[in-house]
């Protein structure tokens, strides 16, 4: 279920504050955040945001087609190692 339109998109205040200061001083360093739940706003375009995946901060470069999605969608939390091979097929 999507968020109600009358509520508007959610973005943590501390993240918005960091983005505004980074844009004001034209800083290209990644903005470190733990807020995976924040929606990507049009102000974020062109910035690199380091999103925490539970273990480390994954750098995410924000482009135009990411607007409206959540930051957590681009920092995967699980690593897929592959399914176990079938022993009968190897023989």
Curated annotation (Swiss-Prot):
Keywords: Ribonucleoprotein, Ribosomal protein, RNA-binding, rRNA-binding. The keyword rRNA-binding applies. GO terms for cellular component: cytoplasm; small ribosomal subunit. InterPro entries: Ribosomal_uS19, Ribosomal_uS19_bac-type, Ribosomal_uS19_CS, Ribosomal_uS19_SF. Pfam families: Ribosomal_S19. Disulfide bonds: none annotated. One of its GO terms (molecular function) is structural constituent of ribosome. One of its GO terms (biological process) is translation. It comes from the Bacteria. The keyword Ribonucleoprotein applies. Belongs to the universal ribosomal protein uS19 family. Protein S19 forms a complex with S13 that binds strongly to the 16S ribosomal RNA. This is Small ribosomal subunit protein uS19. The gene is rpsS.
């Amino acid at each position: 279920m999507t968020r109600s339109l009358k509520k508007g998109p959610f973005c943590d205040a501390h993240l918005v504050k960091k983005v505004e200061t980074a844009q004001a001083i034209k800083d290209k360093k990644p903005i470190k955040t733990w807020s995976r739940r924040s929606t990507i706003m049009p102000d974020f375009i062109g910035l690199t945001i380091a999103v925490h995946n539970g273990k480390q901060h994954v750098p995410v470069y924000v482009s135009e087609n990411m607007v409206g999605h959540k930051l957590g969608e681009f920092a995967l939390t699980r690593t897929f190692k592959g399914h176990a091979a079938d022993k009968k097929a190897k023989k």
